[in-house]
């Protein structure tokens, strides 16, 4: 029998190891972003969930296209080594936002939409969005008491903005 920490938060059958490992890999890549990198999310709950995981990248919350357009003119985006990750919600509106954000921000820069696609494939059927990412990580034993458990390094405290 699997440990209880691998149970789905709603008491459904446990996540299989392959799916759990895929989620762990995505979370690890988010935690591994530098403070120069940017993550764009829709709301404050999304941002707070990422901070609970220990994400150090700058997180920009926006529900408005105007904020994204202002961001397009931001000097930080001129640097080619800045990674930009788009993480809107997984609903139809989120799919529209990710396309719009990508076209408004790309300007020859690489925009990471793969992280969103992988998270959507892992979480959408469970009714979990970006705002629930830290919660599911905790339920699966990847996060304990505001600490991200990275198998390759020491436990470190998550930083809140």
Residue ranges of predicted features:
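Phosphate-handling DNA/RNA-contact segment within nucleic-acid enzymes
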Residues: 1-36, 44-48, 70-72
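TOPRIM fold recognition
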Residues: 2-10, 52-53, 62-161
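Short active-site oxyanion
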Residues: 33-39, 57, 83-84
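Small/polar loops that bind or transfer phosphate-bearing groups
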Residues: 41-43, 89
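Alpha-helix N-cap/helix-start capping motif
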Residues: 43-44, 65
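N-terminal G-site helix/loop of the GST-like fold
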Residues: 45, 52-55
